Every structure is written in C-alpha cells, then in structure tokens.
C-alpha cells in the first residue's frame, strides 16, 4: 500500500472560520496522516476539534495541547485510512506527539515535533529528544521512524536560507547529530540535493525549517515529496508518499552490548585505539567534531568485536 503524509505549521487554529477552512482544505487533499504544529489548542478544545475534523470529512485525530496562544501539536487521519494507528506518547509542553502505525509486521513510529524558537532552548530540546524519542517498545528489527516537524532550524545556511547566512543556525550541530545517531534522512533534501525551496517566509526572509524525516531503511520507498503553498499560514505544507510493502530490514537502532565492553579483548583493543586517537585531537579545530567522530569509531569497534 501507499501511505501519504504531510506536515504543516498552521500558525494557530483558535478562530473557528480558519479552522473550518483548514480542515476542509486538508480533507480535499486526501492525505492519510497529517501532522499539525502550533495549533494553540487547549484541553477544553479537544472533543470539539475532533468532532469538527470528522464533520469536515476526516477520520480520527490526536492532540497534545499547548496554550491558547502558543505551541500545541496534532495528528489528523484521513477518513478512508483504516490502518491501525494508535496514540503512543506525548510530552508535557505541547511540542511532541507520537503515534504508532502497524502495517503487516512493521511498526512505524510517527512523531510530530514542534521545536522551540529560542536557540538555546532548541539545543537542549534536541539533546533531550536524542536520548528519549527513539526508544521503541520492543526490539523488533522492523521498527521505523517517521518524523514530521517544524524544527525552527535550517540545516544548510546557504541552501536553506534566503538570504544565505554567514553562520550556521544555533542548534544545527545537535540537529545533525540526531539525524546521524538515529539513522534518519531528510526526505525532501535527499530527493532535491541542490534545490533552493523554502517552507517559511517572513518579510524578505525565507527558510526551510519544516521537515519530514524517515529511517534510512525506507529511503528507497519514499517518492512524490513536494512543498506546496498553504494559504492559511506563513508556512508551506510538505507532502510525501511511502510505499510500505516489501520494506527491507534496516540497520535499526544500535545498542551497546555490555558483555562486549567488559571483555578483555575489548579493553585491550580500546586502549590501543584510544591512545592513538588522542594524538589526533590536535588536528581538529573543534573538539566537539573530534569527540563526535570518536563516538562513531567506538560504536564500530564494539560492533566488530561483538561479531568475533
């Protein structure tokens, strides 16, 4: 089957007329799973909004509330989408909402994320979700991550901002680390490696800060990704499609084997490697780059010894 997904920062849905327009517009697009950011929903709104979505022709929906003037995320399902989608988890600030989608023997963890505007807060946020977001309920090799988000961060200062910036966005290093550690890829950029296209406009400034991220194991199954104008917000909508049949096993999330690192073989190999690696430190202008690479090498060393 083909799964269609979309992400859009709606810039507030408290106005009833706007909410009706947005819901009807999204229903007309016949998208299976839609992730909304910045809904400005409160707990008092939930039942009414869920009923309104169904009355407009939608299916089930989940919301994680912020306040009446900030944050809030939601996941809307198309009426004809009959697959097994269940609420999974949420944070306490209206920034994260996760659900699970089970298709055959595969489980897709769909995460809707709205990152902070403030750079320092965003760095802490990325570090926090790096440690918690990618933990699954079982150790199956058929767990896959789908992240639909407004990360408030442009990955490439020259391609993803107009006018181009001299410096990287605050938190871009943490963002890239999250992608690498969790084997994720930026769907739109992978299919459009050199294209300048933006998802957010304010005044003369444009940026691509909204993303759909997927596990690399499903990279060959993603197609039809596009950024379309959304008439009810200062953000554009990203839509993609995913062929869910015959997905090959991916590398999954690596977990260090504690028995391996206790072994004499590992301690001996690690000491030799570490003594040499410390000498390389002076070749790096940024010690964080040296340390990030060190962690990758430790992972590879551990995996190699585990296989022996």
For each predicted feature, which ranges?
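Catalytic palm subdomain of template-directed nucleic-acid polymerases
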Residues: 153-170
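Mobile genetic element proteins and their domesticated derivatives, centered on retroelements
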Residues: 9, 26, 31-38, 76, ...
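Surface polyanion/phosphate-binding segment centered on an Asp-His-Pro turn
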Residues: 100-108, 138-141, 145-146, 170, ...
